[in-house]
Structures are given as C-alpha cells and as structure tokens.
C-alpha cells in the first residue's frame, strides 16, 4: 500500500498582482483556483516520485470534489478511502507579492470527523499493509489518537507536519510518538515558546538539538526558507541541509514537498540528512513553478528502494 497520507483537501484561491503590490490598496492582477491542502499536496508529491501512496481524506459531493479524486487517480494515488460528504473540503485564500511570497491569507478548515468512520471500518487493513503514515498533527484529536493507536498496533512509523501550529501545540504530547516531525522556523518557535527570528542555521541547529532531548522527540526537522533546514535526533545527530538556489515564482506547496521528501527518505532507508536532501530537491522544483506540487521523478533519481521500508515505531502513551 506504500505511504498512507491522512488529512484535508483544500481549494486554493491565489491572487497575483500584475504590477508592484500595494498593501491595503487595490491591485490589478490574476486569480487562480487550484486543488491544495497540505495533505493533498503531500500525497501528490509522493505519487510524483512513482511511489503509489494511499490517501485517507474527504471531498465535497460536488464536481470540484470529483475533479480532485480524478486528478489524484491520474497520478496513481489510491483514492479508495476518500469519502464524499457535504462541505468536505476547506478553502485557502492567499495574496502574493511580486516576489512570489504570501502577504495575506485566510483559510476555512473542513470538518474531518467523518474520517473516523473510515478508520473504524478500514483502519486495520490500511495500516497493516502501509509502509509508513503521514498526517497533519493538527487534525481532530480523536483522529490523531486513532492514527497513533493503529500505528502502534501494526508497528508503523508516523511522520507529522502541521498546517495550524496553534492547534498543533495542543497535540504536543503526540510528538514523542512521531518517527519525525517537520515544521518551519516560526512554527518551531511557537512549539518551544521562543522567538527564533534572526537565528542562523548553526544557532537553530544547536537549539533544536537541546530541545528535542528535553522534550523526548525522536527526530525533528525545521525549515528556514532560503537558509535551508536544520535537523536533530534524540540519539545525538544534528546538522544543516543547505537550500538549493532557484528563481522563486510561487512558494505555495514548497514546505509540503519538503515534508514529502523527508517522509519518503526516512520511510525507505535513508539517513535524516539524505532525507532532507530529497526534501530540498522536491521543494526547489516546486518554488520555481506556479504549481503546488513537484514534477515527476523516478525513485532511482534519489537512490530509493521502495521495498525497504523502515518499519520501526516508538512506544506510544495515549
């Protein structure tokens, strides 16, 4: 079944100015609507490395929902566990400046509780055959608890990302049970109640190494934009993964692609540095296009062997 991804589908509405962006003023430009959401982007990124993931999610029972499923199927994603329900998708509205960075955004999250029905009915068959699990840690708490229960039952590693750190902080105890947690510099500051603005990669690497020991987090990666990413593990490894310099067109989905690369690498036997390097390549391929996801790659381009899943999982305390 490969990597199993669990989370929400969003419709992204993105506005781009045709001239210099004027904050608080009227800006002529273009507006695009695309399929998005951290988990939806993640599962398509994994599929674009020809790894045949499975997606547990919800869509609206509308034509847009059907289009989401059709596109994922075209990319060889297993969509058997996507349920169509009223108001099953979220919406993300974002405005970009001329440099491709988000200057304002607002989002409406969907109600993901129907996913619990899927986990109750099919959780055993899904988790038994999975190579690993990837989810947004800020999902409904009952969903997160069910995921970690099934992961422990079948000995599967869980990789966690975040879309709303304020909610994710309430799930902080689950991070000890994650195989690896990935977030950005600002989110790491919220997690550890500190301000990391202006920190160098070397400084943040050392801070992260200290905090994950104290918090008993197995592995953690923090992205720092153009400064790359830093990582640390509970067994004492830490380091910096430099960014790849590319022309920035649209940063949407770059973090999701990075998380996909880390998940892919650690699932299929790579070191944490090698996994970060895969994430960096996928992220760079997203930034230089207007797409939310990476282009097609072959597993061999990253030295991957999909038959060699890591399969270890920490003991959980629910």
Question: Would you name each region that the model predicts?
Answer:
Residues 1-74, 248, 314-318:
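Glycine-rich phosphate/adenosyl-contacting loop at the front of the ribokinase-like
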